[in-house]
Structure formats: C-alpha cells, structure tokens
Amino acid sequence: MTDRSQCTQSGRTMGAQSASQDLQSLDSWLTDRIVTITVGPEEKRWVVHEKLLVSQSDFFRNYFSEGHDEMKLPDDEPRLFALFIRWLYGTAFLPSGGTRNFRFLPPDGVSVSVRDYLGVYVLGGKFGIVGVRNAVLDVLYAYYGEGSGADEHRSPDMHDITYIFEHTTPDAPMRRFLVAHALFYLFSRGRRGAPLPLDWEQVLGRSAEVGYEMIRMLGEWNWVMGANAPRMTIKARTEFHERAPLPEPEVVKQEADDEADASPI
C-alpha cells in the first residue's frame, strides 16, 4: 500500500514538474519579440513569436538573427502557410512528454485537400522543419490506410504524386509512401478488370520518373509469376518519418535516384 502510494505521488510530482517546464517554455516563447511574415503576392500578414519560430528552423533563425523585423515570402501560398502556423502553435501548446501529438484534421476536399497537405510538406522542406513534414505524413497515413488487401483501396491522385516528385528530392519519404499506395490500389481486388483512372494515363504518359519509380518498387517486392502474392501492408507510419535535420533547400533533382530508400512495405 505504501509502495503504491509512493509511486502515485512520484508520478504526480513528475507530471507537475513537466507541466511547470512546459509553462516556462511557453512564457519564454510568448513573451519574446514579435516578427511579421507576409506571404504571397497579396502579402497576407502574420505576426509570429520569433523565439517559437526560430526554435524550429534555421531558415528563419538565420534571417531574423540579422535583426530583421519582417520577412516576405512572395512565392508561397497563404493557405499553406496558415496550415503551417496551425502546426507551429499547436505543437507549442501540447505538453512535452505526453502521449498526445498535434494532429492535422483529415482532408475533406473542401476546407483542406490532400494537395494542401502536400504543399505544407514541401513548405516544410523549404523551411527545413522535419516536424511539420512528419505531421503531414501522419494525417495522410490515416487517410489512405494500411493497404492490407481490402477490396477497395484509396489511390493517390497521380497529379499529386507528380507534384511531390517535382518539388522534393529523390530521398523524400513521401515519394515512396504515395507510390506504394498507388501500387496497392493497382492490385486491389476492387479494381480488378476495371480500366485505370484517367489521371494515371495523363501522368504516366509524360512522366518517366514516376513510372520508373513504380516499376522499381515492384521489382523490390520479389513476386514470382504463378505464386500467390503474399499479404502486404504499408510499413508503420514512423518508417516514413524524417529524423535528421533537413538539408539546406536546393534545386530539386528530377532524375531518379538509384540510391533511394528501400521498399516501404
């Protein structure tokens, strides 16, 4: 009885200490200098706590460390930057060490689309922020499912896959994730005998890189003609997470990379 009481008291103490540390971090972030960021050709303005912003990104840290009060991002979309800001403050207000993580809302095609989230993924690459890219991967992982051989499998739009190939480097996990789901759709029981969607013809007819990546991934599955295909599922979502700081933004290579990561299933 005493041991249990002591364990309970210890847990409460640790929880209180964690909460206190979280509040101290928030006080530090939310009482610091405010900076302005204008986004898009219409120059939509956001006022952001500088310390919170630079704690996540060398892209912002290097700029604001020179004493600037305002940053202009004329080539980015305000809609996507708004989603990034939602993630930035959403993660700041979640307790550290807890079981909860910030989650984007599932795409509904109206208030937010798959393409919107892919745009945020690309934006995360520009800013060098792994966390927001992983958050995008998480919401799309839930949206597309695990691909466990169901009769129906939701396929990514091929135009979305092309968008990711055009705006990311060959080692981006999102490439493998989307290609794997496209292949799971191709071999789903519900699609058997049906023609391929129009977007497949439109994209694969002009994008050798996407087609090559699909064939390369199929080769890695090691299927044997005449043998039953094994039950297959998409790897755990954390297998698609990026854990190291992203490199400085650079011109995206368009050719396929023979050294890309292994099959995601």
Name the predicted role of every residue range.
Residues 1-52, 79, 86-115, 252:
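N-terminal BTB/POZ boundary and linker segment
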Residues 86, 93-192:
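Post-BTB helical module
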Residues 196-257:
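Eukaryote-biased recognition of C-terminal alpha-helical segments
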Residues 2-4, 262-265:
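A positional/structural detector of protein chain ends, strongest at the extreme C-terminus
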Residues 9, 13, 244-246, 261:
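Phospho-regulated RS/SR low-complexity segments
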Residues 55-70, 93-95:
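Cytochrome P450 catalytic domain signature, combining two hallmark sequence patches
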